[in-house]
Amino acid sequence: MAPAATASTGTKGIVRQVIGPVLDVEFPAGKLPKILNALRIEGKNPAGQDIGLTAEVQQLLGDHRVRAVAMSGTDGLVRGMEAVDTGAPISVPVGEATLGRIFNVLGEPVDEQGPIKSSTTSPIHRSAPKLTDLETKPKVFETGIKVIDLLAPYRQGGKVGLFGGAGVGKTVLIQELINNIAKEHGGVSVFGGVGERTREGNDLYEEFKESGVINADNLTESKVALCFGQMNEPPGARMRVGLSALTMAEHFRDVNKQDVLLFIDNIFRFVQAGSEVSALLGRMPSAVGYQPTLGTDVGELQERITSTLEGSITSIQAVYVPADDLTDPAPATTFAHLDATTVLARALAAKGIYPAVDPLDSTSTMLQPAVVGDEHYRTARAVQSTLQRYKELQDIIAILGLDELSEEDRKTFDRARKIEKFLSQPFFVAEIFTGMSGKYVKLEETIAGFNMILSGELDNLPEQAFYLVGNIEEVKAKAQKINSENKG
Protein backbone atom coordinates (compact mmCIF):
# COMPACT_ATOMS: atom_id res chain seq x y z
CA MET A 1 0.00 0.00 0.00
CA ALA A 2 1.11 3.58 -0.66
CA PRO A 3 1.98 5.76 2.34
CA ALA A 4 -0.59 8.34 3.48
CA ALA A 5 -0.94 11.36 1.20
CA THR A 6 0.83 14.53 2.29
CA ALA A 7 0.38 18.10 1.06
CA SER A 8 2.70 18.60 -1.88
CA THR A 9 2.93 21.38 -4.43
CA GLY A 10 4.80 20.81 -7.64
CA THR A 11 5.26 17.07 -7.10
CA LYS A 12 5.58 15.39 -10.48
CA GLY A 13 3.94 12.13 -11.45
CA ILE A 14 3.71 10.01 -14.60
CA VAL A 15 0.49 9.19 -16.50
CA ARG A 16 0.21 5.38 -16.48
CA GLN A 17 -3.26 4.79 -17.95
CA VAL A 18 -5.86 6.77 -19.90
CA ILE A 19 -9.46 5.50 -20.18
CA GLY A 20 -11.50 8.22 -21.86
CA PRO A 21 -11.80 11.13 -19.42
CA VAL A 22 -10.24 9.13 -16.55
CA LEU A 23 -6.48 8.82 -16.03
CA ASP A 24 -4.24 6.99 -13.56
CA VAL A 25 -1.11 8.83 -12.44
CA GLU A 26 1.84 7.39 -10.49
CA PHE A 27 3.61 9.60 -7.94
CA PRO A 28 6.77 9.11 -5.84
CA ALA A 29 6.24 7.22 -2.56
CA GLY A 30 4.98 9.46 0.24
CA LYS A 31 4.09 12.33 -2.11
CA LEU A 32 0.60 11.43 -3.27
CA PRO A 33 -1.76 14.37 -3.91
CA LYS A 34 -4.85 14.76 -1.73
CA ILE A 35 -8.28 13.81 -3.05
CA LEU A 36 -9.85 16.79 -4.95
CA ASN A 37 -6.42 18.30 -5.71
CA ALA A 38 -5.96 19.57 -9.27
CA LEU A 39 -3.31 17.94 -11.47
CA ARG A 40 -1.88 19.85 -14.43
CA ILE A 41 -0.60 18.05 -17.54
CA GLU A 42 1.26 20.16 -20.11
CA GLY A 43 3.72 19.50 -22.90
CA LYS A 44 3.91 17.76 -26.26
CA ASN A 45 2.99 14.16 -26.96
CA PRO A 46 5.19 11.96 -29.21
CA ALA A 47 3.19 13.12 -32.26
CA GLY A 48 4.11 16.74 -31.50
CA GLN A 49 0.62 17.81 -30.37
CA ASP A 50 0.42 20.44 -27.62
CA ILE A 51 -1.37 19.03 -24.57
CA GLY A 52 -2.72 21.17 -21.73
CA LEU A 53 -5.35 19.83 -19.38
CA THR A 54 -6.39 19.86 -15.73
CA ALA A 55 -7.68 16.79 -13.90
CA GLU A 56 -9.15 16.38 -10.41
CA VAL A 57 -7.99 13.56 -8.11
CA GLN A 58 -10.90 11.27 -7.21
CA GLN A 59 -9.35 8.07 -5.82
CA LEU A 60 -6.13 6.83 -4.22
CA LEU A 61 -5.58 3.39 -5.73
CA GLY A 62 -2.52 2.05 -3.90
CA ASP A 63 0.88 1.31 -5.48
CA HIS A 64 1.56 5.09 -5.40
CA ARG A 65 -1.21 5.70 -7.98
CA VAL A 66 -4.16 8.09 -8.05
CA ARG A 67 -7.15 8.13 -10.36
CA ALA A 68 -8.21 11.54 -11.69
CA VAL A 69 -11.04 12.87 -13.86
CA ALA A 70 -10.13 15.25 -16.70
CA MET A 71 -11.86 18.64 -16.98
CA SER A 72 -11.32 18.79 -20.76
CA GLY A 73 -10.84 16.32 -23.62
CA THR A 74 -8.00 13.80 -23.30
CA ASP A 75 -7.41 13.53 -27.07
CA GLY A 76 -3.68 13.16 -27.73
CA LEU A 77 -2.82 12.35 -24.09
CA VAL A 78 -0.44 9.37 -23.87
CA ARG A 79 1.09 7.23 -21.15
CA GLY A 80 4.39 8.49 -19.85
CA MET A 81 3.47 12.19 -19.90
CA GLU A 82 4.23 14.28 -16.82
CA ALA A 83 1.47 15.39 -14.40
CA VAL A 84 2.11 18.05 -11.76
CA ASP A 85 0.22 18.21 -8.44
CA THR A 86 -0.88 21.84 -7.92
CA GLY A 87 -1.32 21.17 -4.19
CA ALA A 88 -4.83 22.67 -4.11
CA PRO A 89 -8.33 22.14 -5.56
CA ILE A 90 -9.43 23.84 -8.79
CA SER A 91 -9.74 27.60 -8.13
CA VAL A 92 -11.74 30.18 -10.09
CA PRO A 93 -11.58 34.00 -10.25
CA VAL A 94 -14.11 35.85 -8.06
CA GLY A 95 -15.29 39.43 -7.54
CA GLU A 96 -16.47 42.28 -9.79
CA ALA A 97 -13.98 41.35 -12.52
CA THR A 98 -16.13 38.28 -13.32
CA LEU A 99 -19.24 40.32 -14.24
CA GLY A 100 -20.08 40.38 -17.94
CA ARG A 101 -17.67 37.52 -18.66
CA ILE A 102 -18.11 33.86 -19.67
CA PHE A 103 -15.98 31.18 -17.97
CA ASN A 104 -15.39 27.47 -18.27
CA VAL A 105 -15.21 25.09 -15.29
CA LEU A 106 -11.60 26.13 -14.56
CA GLY A 107 -12.46 29.83 -14.43
CA GLU A 108 -10.76 30.51 -17.75
CA PRO A 109 -12.52 33.17 -19.89
CA VAL A 110 -13.99 31.76 -23.11
CA ASP A 111 -15.56 34.94 -24.52
CA GLU A 112 -12.51 36.29 -26.41
CA GLN A 113 -12.55 39.44 -24.25
CA GLY A 114 -8.99 39.01 -22.99
CA PRO A 115 -7.66 37.90 -19.58
CA ILE A 116 -9.50 38.53 -16.30
CA LYS A 117 -8.37 41.62 -14.40
CA SER A 118 -8.51 39.94 -10.99
CA SER A 119 -5.89 38.32 -8.81
CA THR A 120 -8.51 37.02 -6.35
CA THR A 121 -9.36 33.33 -6.74
CA SER A 122 -11.27 30.88 -4.59
CA PRO A 123 -11.29 27.03 -4.47
CA ILE A 124 -14.48 25.41 -5.78
CA HIS A 125 -14.65 22.93 -2.87
CA ARG A 126 -15.76 24.60 0.37
CA SER A 127 -17.81 23.77 3.45
CA ALA A 128 -21.39 24.97 3.83
CA PRO A 129 -21.91 27.96 6.21
CA LYS A 130 -22.28 27.15 9.92
CA LEU A 131 -25.80 26.81 11.31
CA THR A 132 -25.22 29.80 13.61
CA ASP A 133 -24.45 32.03 10.58
CA LEU A 134 -27.71 31.31 8.74
CA GLU A 135 -30.54 33.82 8.28
CA THR A 136 -33.87 32.23 9.24
CA LYS A 137 -36.47 35.01 8.77
CA PRO A 138 -38.61 34.25 5.68
CA LYS A 139 -39.04 37.02 3.11
CA VAL A 140 -40.97 36.76 -0.18
CA PHE A 141 -39.10 37.49 -3.40
CA GLU A 142 -41.33 39.11 -6.07
CA THR A 143 -40.74 37.92 -9.65
CA GLY A 144 -43.44 39.83 -11.57
CA ILE A 145 -44.81 36.52 -12.93
CA LYS A 146 -48.44 36.12 -11.78
CA VAL A 147 -48.68 32.35 -11.42
CA ILE A 148 -45.45 32.17 -9.39
CA ASP A 149 -46.06 35.16 -7.12
CA LEU A 150 -49.62 34.07 -6.31
CA LEU A 151 -49.47 30.27 -6.00
CA ALA A 152 -45.84 29.28 -5.35
CA PRO A 153 -43.99 32.41 -4.12
CA TYR A 154 -40.20 32.33 -3.97
CA ARG A 155 -38.21 32.93 -0.80
CA GLN A 156 -35.36 35.44 -0.74
CA GLY A 157 -32.26 33.37 -0.09
CA GLY A 158 -34.20 30.19 -0.84
CA LYS A 159 -33.85 27.41 -3.39
CA VAL A 160 -36.37 27.04 -6.19
CA GLY A 161 -36.67 24.17 -8.67
CA LEU A 162 -38.19 24.50 -12.15
CA PHE A 163 -39.32 20.99 -13.02
CA GLY A 164 -40.33 19.98 -16.52
CA GLY A 165 -39.72 17.60 -19.41
CA ALA A 166 -38.06 18.55 -22.67
CA GLY A 167 -39.42 21.61 -24.47
CA VAL A 168 -41.95 22.93 -21.94
CA GLY A 169 -40.16 26.24 -21.31
CA LYS A 170 -37.69 25.89 -18.40
CA THR A 171 -34.88 27.90 -20.01
CA VAL A 172 -37.23 30.65 -21.27
CA LEU A 173 -38.69 30.98 -17.75
CA ILE A 174 -35.16 31.28 -16.31
CA GLN A 175 -34.29 33.96 -18.89
CA GLU A 176 -37.45 35.90 -17.98
CA LEU A 177 -36.66 35.67 -14.27
CA ILE A 178 -33.12 36.98 -14.87
CA ASN A 179 -34.53 39.82 -16.97
CA ASN A 180 -37.22 40.80 -14.42
CA ILE A 181 -34.94 40.53 -11.41
CA ALA A 182 -32.10 42.51 -13.02
CA LYS A 183 -34.54 45.32 -13.90
CA GLU A 184 -36.63 45.41 -10.72
CA HIS A 185 -34.21 44.33 -7.98
CA GLY A 186 -30.79 45.29 -9.36
CA GLY A 187 -28.05 43.26 -7.71
CA VAL A 188 -25.84 40.65 -9.30
CA SER A 189 -26.58 37.24 -10.78
CA VAL A 190 -24.41 34.25 -11.58
CA PHE A 191 -25.54 31.80 -14.27
CA GLY A 192 -24.25 28.22 -14.26
CA GLY A 193 -24.87 26.41 -17.55
CA VAL A 194 -24.52 22.75 -16.64
CA GLY A 195 -24.56 20.29 -19.53
CA GLU A 196 -26.99 22.24 -21.70
CA ARG A 197 -26.85 23.13 -25.41
CA THR A 198 -24.09 25.44 -26.68
CA ARG A 199 -26.72 27.30 -28.75
CA GLU A 200 -28.69 28.13 -25.59
CA GLY A 201 -25.59 29.58 -23.95
CA ASN A 202 -24.95 31.78 -26.98
CA ASP A 203 -28.62 32.88 -27.15
CA LEU A 204 -28.55 33.74 -23.44
CA TYR A 205 -25.38 35.83 -23.81
CA GLU A 206 -26.84 37.78 -26.75
CA GLU A 207 -30.14 38.24 -24.86
CA PHE A 208 -28.25 39.68 -21.87
CA LYS A 209 -26.39 42.12 -24.11
CA GLU A 210 -29.62 43.29 -25.75
CA SER A 211 -31.44 43.77 -22.43
CA GLY A 212 -28.47 45.62 -20.85
CA VAL A 213 -27.79 42.95 -18.18
CA ILE A 214 -24.36 42.72 -19.83
CA ASN A 215 -22.82 45.99 -21.03
CA ALA A 216 -20.33 44.90 -23.71
CA ASP A 217 -18.85 48.42 -23.97
CA ASN A 218 -18.29 48.79 -20.22
CA LEU A 219 -18.19 45.39 -18.50
CA THR A 220 -18.00 46.99 -15.03
CA GLU A 221 -21.69 47.95 -15.43
CA SER A 222 -22.72 44.34 -16.13
CA LYS A 223 -24.94 42.49 -13.66
CA VAL A 224 -24.20 38.82 -14.40
CA ALA A 225 -21.29 36.38 -14.58
CA LEU A 226 -21.70 33.22 -16.70
CA CYS A 227 -20.04 29.86 -16.18
CA PHE A 228 -20.60 27.15 -18.81
CA GLY A 229 -19.85 23.44 -19.00
CA GLN A 230 -21.80 22.40 -22.08
CA MET A 231 -23.19 19.12 -23.40
CA ASN A 232 -20.16 18.46 -25.60
CA GLU A 233 -17.71 18.68 -22.69
CA PRO A 234 -16.39 15.72 -20.64
CA PRO A 235 -18.41 14.58 -17.60
CA GLY A 236 -15.79 16.00 -15.20
CA ALA A 237 -16.43 19.54 -16.47
CA ARG A 238 -20.22 19.13 -16.33
CA MET A 239 -19.97 17.70 -12.81
CA ARG A 240 -17.91 20.61 -11.45
CA VAL A 241 -19.13 23.69 -13.35
CA GLY A 242 -22.06 24.12 -10.93
CA LEU A 243 -19.55 24.42 -8.08
CA SER A 244 -17.51 26.96 -10.09
CA ALA A 245 -20.60 29.17 -10.54
CA LEU A 246 -21.58 28.72 -6.87
CA THR A 247 -18.08 29.76 -5.73
CA MET A 248 -18.40 33.04 -7.68
CA ALA A 249 -21.83 33.65 -6.08
CA GLU A 250 -20.50 32.87 -2.57
CA HIS A 251 -17.84 35.59 -2.92
CA PHE A 252 -20.50 38.24 -3.65
CA ARG A 253 -22.48 37.02 -0.60
CA ASP A 254 -19.66 36.57 1.93
CA VAL A 255 -17.11 39.22 0.92
CA ASN A 256 -19.21 41.90 -0.82
CA LYS A 257 -22.16 41.18 1.53
CA GLN A 258 -24.66 41.31 -1.35
CA ASP A 259 -27.90 39.52 -2.18
CA VAL A 260 -27.04 37.31 -5.14
CA LEU A 261 -29.07 35.27 -7.62
CA LEU A 262 -27.69 31.94 -8.74
CA PHE A 263 -29.27 30.31 -11.80
CA ILE A 264 -28.39 26.72 -12.61
CA ASP A 265 -29.55 25.15 -15.87
CA ASN A 266 -29.70 22.13 -15.47
CA ILE A 267 -29.37 20.26 -12.16
CA PHE A 268 -30.28 16.97 -13.86
CA ARG A 269 -27.19 17.28 -16.10
CA PHE A 270 -25.09 17.73 -12.95
CA VAL A 271 -26.48 14.44 -11.61
CA GLN A 272 -26.07 12.79 -15.02
CA ALA A 273 -22.40 13.83 -15.19
CA GLY A 274 -21.86 12.48 -11.67
CA SER A 275 -23.39 9.19 -12.80
CA GLU A 276 -20.98 9.00 -15.77
CA VAL A 277 -17.96 9.76 -13.57
CA SER A 278 -19.11 7.23 -10.97
CA ALA A 279 -19.29 4.49 -13.63
CA LEU A 280 -15.86 5.46 -15.02
CA LEU A 281 -14.41 5.19 -11.51
CA GLY A 282 -15.81 1.66 -11.24
CA ARG A 283 -18.48 2.25 -8.60
CA MET A 284 -21.51 -0.04 -8.50
CA PRO A 285 -24.58 1.80 -9.88
CA SER A 286 -27.63 2.40 -7.69
CA ALA A 287 -31.36 2.74 -8.57
CA VAL A 288 -32.07 3.39 -12.29
CA GLY A 289 -28.31 3.42 -12.96
CA TYR A 290 -27.55 6.52 -10.88
CA GLN A 291 -24.41 6.81 -8.76
CA PRO A 292 -24.61 5.35 -5.21
CA THR A 293 -23.50 8.78 -3.90
CA LEU A 294 -26.46 10.64 -5.49
CA GLY A 295 -27.79 12.09 -2.21
CA THR A 296 -24.31 13.22 -1.10
CA ASP A 297 -23.44 14.81 -4.46
CA VAL A 298 -26.67 16.84 -4.57
CA GLY A 299 -26.43 17.72 -0.86
CA GLU A 300 -22.87 19.06 -1.13
CA LEU A 301 -23.99 21.52 -3.80
CA GLN A 302 -27.37 22.48 -2.29
CA GLU A 303 -26.24 23.02 1.31
CA ARG A 304 -23.82 25.76 0.21
CA ILE A 305 -26.69 27.68 -1.42
CA THR A 306 -28.21 29.57 1.50
CA SER A 307 -28.77 32.92 3.25
CA THR A 308 -26.34 34.08 5.92
CA LEU A 309 -26.48 37.10 8.23
CA GLU A 310 -24.16 38.89 5.76
CA GLY A 311 -26.06 38.31 2.49
CA SER A 312 -28.15 35.81 0.56
CA ILE A 313 -27.97 33.50 -2.43
CA THR A 314 -31.37 32.95 -4.01
CA SER A 315 -31.06 29.98 -6.33
CA ILE A 316 -33.33 29.14 -9.24
CA GLN A 317 -32.56 25.75 -10.74
CA ALA A 318 -33.99 24.09 -13.81
CA VAL A 319 -34.52 20.36 -13.29
CA TYR A 320 -35.12 18.21 -16.37
CA VAL A 321 -37.59 15.44 -15.56
CA PRO A 322 -36.78 12.27 -17.55
CA ALA A 323 -39.89 11.00 -19.37
CA ASP A 324 -41.97 13.49 -17.30
CA ASP A 325 -41.55 11.13 -14.29
CA LEU A 326 -41.24 13.16 -11.07
CA THR A 327 -40.46 9.98 -9.09
CA ASP A 328 -37.17 9.48 -10.97
CA PRO A 329 -34.31 9.50 -8.37
CA ALA A 330 -32.68 12.67 -9.80
CA PRO A 331 -35.67 15.06 -9.48
CA ALA A 332 -36.90 13.23 -6.35
CA THR A 333 -33.55 13.80 -4.56
CA THR A 334 -33.53 17.47 -5.60
CA PHE A 335 -37.09 18.02 -4.26
CA ALA A 336 -35.92 17.50 -0.66
CA HIS A 337 -33.66 20.60 -0.76
CA LEU A 338 -36.10 23.12 -2.22
CA ASP A 339 -38.22 25.89 -0.66
CA ALA A 340 -40.46 26.14 -3.73
CA THR A 341 -41.14 23.96 -6.75
CA THR A 342 -42.43 25.32 -10.04
CA VAL A 343 -43.71 22.39 -12.11
CA LEU A 344 -44.14 22.94 -15.85
CA ALA A 345 -46.89 20.85 -17.44
CA ARG A 346 -46.87 19.63 -21.03
CA ALA A 347 -50.70 19.68 -21.10
CA LEU A 348 -50.72 23.44 -20.43
CA ALA A 349 -48.01 24.07 -23.04
CA ALA A 350 -50.15 22.12 -25.53
CA LYS A 351 -53.08 24.49 -24.77
CA GLY A 352 -50.81 27.50 -25.42
CA ILE A 353 -50.83 28.62 -21.76
CA TYR A 354 -47.40 30.17 -21.19
CA PRO A 355 -45.66 30.06 -18.78
CA ALA A 356 -46.89 26.45 -18.60
CA VAL A 357 -46.72 26.38 -14.78
CA ASP A 358 -49.02 23.78 -13.21
CA PRO A 359 -51.01 25.73 -10.56
CA LEU A 360 -51.94 22.56 -8.63
CA ASP A 361 -48.60 20.72 -8.70
CA SER A 362 -46.38 23.74 -7.89
CA THR A 363 -45.68 24.29 -4.18
CA SER A 364 -43.96 26.73 -1.83
CA THR A 365 -43.14 26.72 1.88
CA MET A 366 -43.85 30.49 1.78
CA LEU A 367 -47.57 30.09 1.04
CA GLN A 368 -48.80 30.42 4.62
CA PRO A 369 -50.77 33.29 6.22
CA ALA A 370 -47.98 34.19 8.67
CA VAL A 371 -45.62 34.91 5.76
CA VAL A 372 -47.70 36.20 2.82
CA GLY A 373 -50.69 37.59 4.75
CA ASP A 374 -54.32 36.46 4.96
CA GLU A 375 -55.59 38.04 1.72
CA HIS A 376 -52.84 36.53 -0.45
CA TYR A 377 -53.26 33.13 1.21
CA ARG A 378 -57.07 33.09 0.84
CA THR A 379 -56.90 34.20 -2.80
CA ALA A 380 -54.30 31.55 -3.67
CA ARG A 381 -56.28 28.76 -2.00
CA ALA A 382 -59.54 29.90 -3.65
CA VAL A 383 -57.84 29.89 -7.07
CA GLN A 384 -56.48 26.38 -6.45
CA SER A 385 -59.82 24.99 -5.22
CA THR A 386 -61.61 26.51 -8.25
CA LEU A 387 -59.06 24.91 -10.60
CA GLN A 388 -59.34 21.59 -8.75
CA ARG A 389 -63.14 21.64 -9.17
CA TYR A 390 -62.65 22.54 -12.86
CA LYS A 391 -60.47 19.45 -13.24
CA GLU A 392 -63.22 17.28 -11.70
CA LEU A 393 -65.93 18.88 -13.87
CA GLN A 394 -63.98 18.12 -17.05
CA ASP A 395 -64.56 14.39 -16.44
CA ILE A 396 -68.30 14.97 -15.98
CA ILE A 397 -68.48 17.14 -19.13
CA ALA A 398 -66.61 14.50 -21.15
CA ILE A 399 -69.32 11.95 -20.27
CA LEU A 400 -72.55 13.98 -19.94
CA GLY A 401 -71.82 17.27 -21.73
CA LEU A 402 -71.74 20.90 -20.58
CA ASP A 403 -75.54 21.25 -20.45
CA GLU A 404 -75.82 18.75 -17.58
CA LEU A 405 -73.91 21.00 -15.13
CA SER A 406 -75.78 22.85 -12.37
CA GLU A 407 -75.85 26.65 -12.53
CA GLU A 408 -73.25 26.88 -9.72
CA ASP A 409 -70.92 24.40 -11.43
CA ARG A 410 -71.34 26.24 -14.74
CA LYS A 411 -70.19 29.47 -13.04
CA THR A 412 -67.21 27.67 -11.48
CA PHE A 413 -66.35 26.17 -14.88
CA ASP A 414 -66.43 29.55 -16.65
CA ARG A 415 -64.43 31.32 -13.92
CA ALA A 416 -61.84 28.54 -13.82
CA ARG A 417 -61.28 28.86 -17.57
CA LYS A 418 -60.76 32.62 -17.11
CA ILE A 419 -58.35 31.97 -14.22
CA GLU A 420 -56.40 29.47 -16.35
CA LYS A 421 -56.12 32.03 -19.16
CA PHE A 422 -55.24 34.86 -16.73
CA LEU A 423 -52.37 32.78 -15.33
CA SER A 424 -50.70 33.15 -18.74
CA GLN A 425 -48.51 36.18 -19.35
CA PRO A 426 -46.43 37.64 -22.20
CA PHE A 427 -42.66 37.51 -21.51
CA PHE A 428 -40.08 40.18 -22.27
CA VAL A 429 -37.61 37.56 -23.53
CA ALA A 430 -40.25 36.00 -25.84
CA GLU A 431 -41.30 39.24 -27.59
CA ILE A 432 -39.55 38.11 -30.77
CA PHE A 433 -41.76 34.96 -30.90
CA THR A 434 -45.10 36.35 -29.70
CA GLY A 435 -44.93 39.87 -31.12
CA MET A 436 -46.34 41.05 -27.76
CA SER A 437 -44.51 43.27 -25.29
CA GLY A 438 -43.60 41.60 -21.98
CA LYS A 439 -45.42 42.41 -18.72
CA TYR A 440 -44.17 42.69 -15.13
CA VAL A 441 -47.16 42.44 -12.77
CA LYS A 442 -46.90 43.64 -9.17
CA LEU A 443 -48.13 41.23 -6.49
CA GLU A 444 -50.94 43.58 -5.33
CA GLU A 445 -52.29 43.80 -8.90
CA THR A 446 -52.12 40.00 -9.24
CA ILE A 447 -54.10 39.41 -6.03
CA ALA A 448 -56.68 42.10 -6.93
CA GLY A 449 -57.17 40.64 -10.42
CA PHE A 450 -57.82 37.08 -9.25
CA ASN A 451 -60.15 38.31 -6.49
CA MET A 452 -62.27 40.08 -9.12
CA ILE A 453 -62.54 36.88 -11.20
CA LEU A 454 -63.44 34.78 -8.13
CA SER A 455 -66.09 37.26 -6.94
CA GLY A 456 -67.89 37.16 -10.30
CA GLU A 457 -67.29 40.85 -11.13
CA LEU A 458 -65.86 39.87 -14.51
CA ASP A 459 -68.36 37.13 -15.44
CA ASN A 460 -69.64 39.22 -18.36
CA LEU A 461 -66.20 39.57 -20.03
CA PRO A 462 -65.24 37.16 -22.84
CA GLU A 463 -62.80 34.38 -21.94
CA GLN A 464 -60.23 35.29 -24.62
CA ALA A 465 -59.75 38.75 -23.03
CA PHE A 466 -57.88 37.06 -20.15
CA TYR A 467 -55.31 35.34 -22.38
CA LEU A 468 -51.69 36.60 -22.46
CA VAL A 469 -52.20 39.89 -20.64
CA GLY A 470 -50.66 41.58 -17.59
CA ASN A 471 -53.03 43.08 -15.01
CA ILE A 472 -56.84 43.21 -14.92
CA GLU A 473 -56.98 46.68 -16.54
CA GLU A 474 -55.48 45.15 -19.68
CA VAL A 475 -58.18 42.46 -19.57
CA LYS A 476 -60.91 45.13 -19.56
CA ALA A 477 -59.25 47.03 -22.42
CA LYS A 478 -58.89 43.82 -24.44
CA ALA A 479 -62.54 42.88 -23.76
CA GLN A 480 -63.67 46.31 -25.01
CA LYS A 481 -61.60 45.84 -28.16
CA ILE A 482 -63.08 42.35 -28.77
CA ASN A 483 -66.64 43.67 -28.29
CA SER A 484 -66.11 46.57 -30.70
CA GLU A 485 -64.60 44.19 -33.30
CA ASN A 486 -67.58 41.84 -32.95
CA LYS A 487 -70.03 44.74 -33.40
CA GLY A 488 -68.07 45.97 -36.42
UniProtKB/Swiss-Prot annotation:
Membrane-topology descriptor: Peripheral membrane protein
Reaction catalysis annotation: ATP + H2O + 4 H(+)(in) = ADP + phosphate + 5 H(+)(out)
Keywords: ATP synthesis, ATP-binding, CF(1), Hydrogen ion transport, Ion transport, Membrane, Nucleotide-binding, Thylakoid, Translocase, Transport
GO molecular function terms attached to this record: ATP binding; ATP hydrolysis activity; proton-transporting ATP synthase activity, rotational mechanism
Family: Belongs to the ATPase alpha/beta chains family.
Subunit structure: F-type ATPases have 2 components, CF(1) - the catalytic core - and CF(0) - the membrane proton channel. CF(1) has five subunits: alpha(3), beta(3), gamma(1), delta(1), epsilon(1). CF(0) has four main subunits: a(1), b(1), b'(1) and c(9-12).
Protein's recorded name: ATP synthase subunit beta
Gene responsible for this protein: atpD
